[in-house]
From Swiss-Prot:
Regulation: Inhibited by PMSF, bovine aprotinin (APR), and soybean trypsin inhibitor (STI). Is not inhibited by EDTA, beta-mercaptoethanol, and high temperature (85 degrees Celsius).
Enzyme class: hydrolase
Native source organism of the sequence: Crotalus atrox (Western diamondback rattlesnake)
Protein name: Alpha-fibrinogenase A1
Compartment(s) where it occurs, according to its Swiss-Prot or TrEMBL record: Secreted
EC number in record: 3.4.21.-
Length: 21
């Protein structure tokens, strides 16, 4: 689960960066 969460966090951060731009 932790590994999956890490992947999810990476994807979430990418989305946040896009929205932040």
């Amino acid at each position: 689960v932790i590994g999956g969460d890490e992947c999810n966090i990476n994807e979430h951060r990418s989305l946040v960066a896009i929205f932040d731009s």
